[in-house]
Swiss-Prot record:
Probably deamidates glutamine residues to glutamate on methyl-accepting chemotaxis receptors (MCPs), playing an important role in chemotaxis. GO terms for molecular function: protein-glutamine glutaminase activity. This is Probable chemoreceptor glutamine deamidase CheD. It comes from the Bacteria. It holds the Pfam family CheD. SUPFAM superfamilies: CNF1/YfiH-like putative cysteine hydrolases (SSF64438).
Length: 194
């Protein structure tokens, strides 16, 4: 059975001339193929983790650091960093990566919604991913975290190469609308006590 949190939005990126997968919040993807993994990040974070020797890599896209249900058990959903990081690493290892060869590049965690500045979700996500990778002794080779801008990210898992574009939004509220939509979706799908 295919994990429903495994990204499935495949397309051909004509500008980059390569097969691609677009990751939405709460998704992850692992591959050995020559392709690009892409996403757009606001307050969310993506960890791009790859094995430099076996050339296998993957990426996740999570919305919040972690969550627990009313019984104190972690919620197994890739929208939350704890689960998203764990499943990405497990899938990399299951597909042939070796723990000692894993390295990471991390992006996102912007505080892009004025209303969210007080809760600083982006900063919480950024701190979480750095702490998680340090605890698992996976070095961070590069990253672009926090700030006030959304980012468009392209990750080439076989080589570890990243293309990053900061989206300087002036009158376009698309990212903010998406962030609000995903936040509402998150609240409606995670029920207390589950």
């Amino acid at each position: 059975m295919v994990d429903p949190q495994f990204a499935s939005n495949f397309y051909f990126d004509q500008r980059l001339n390569i097969d691609a997968v677009k990751l939405l919040p709460g998704e992850y993807f692992v591959t050995t193929r020559e392709m690009v993994l892409s996403t757009v990040l606001g307050s969310c974070v993506s960890a791009c983790i790859y094995d430099q020797q076996s050339r296998i890599g993957g990426m996740n896209h999570f919305m919040l650091p972690s969550s627990e249900n009313s019984s104190g058990f972690p919620i197994e959903c890739a929208r939350f960093g704890g689960y998203a990081m764990g499943i990405l690493i497990r899938e990399l290892l299951k597909n042939g990566a070796r723990k000692q060869n894993l390295v990471a590049k991390v992006f996102g965690g912007g505080n892009v919604q004025p209303a969210m500045v007080t809760s600083a979700i982006g900063s919480q996500n950024a701190r979480f991913v750095k702490k998680y990778l340090a605890e698992y002794e996976i070095p961070i080779l590069a990253g672009d975290l926090e700030g006030f801008y959304p980012r468009k990210l392209h990750f080439f898992p076989k080589s570890g190469r990243v293309l990053l574009k900061k989206l300087h939004v002036s009158h376009n509220d698309t990212i903010a609308k998406r962030e609000k939509h995903y936040s509402r979706l998150l609240l409606s799908t995670v029920k207390p006590g589950i």
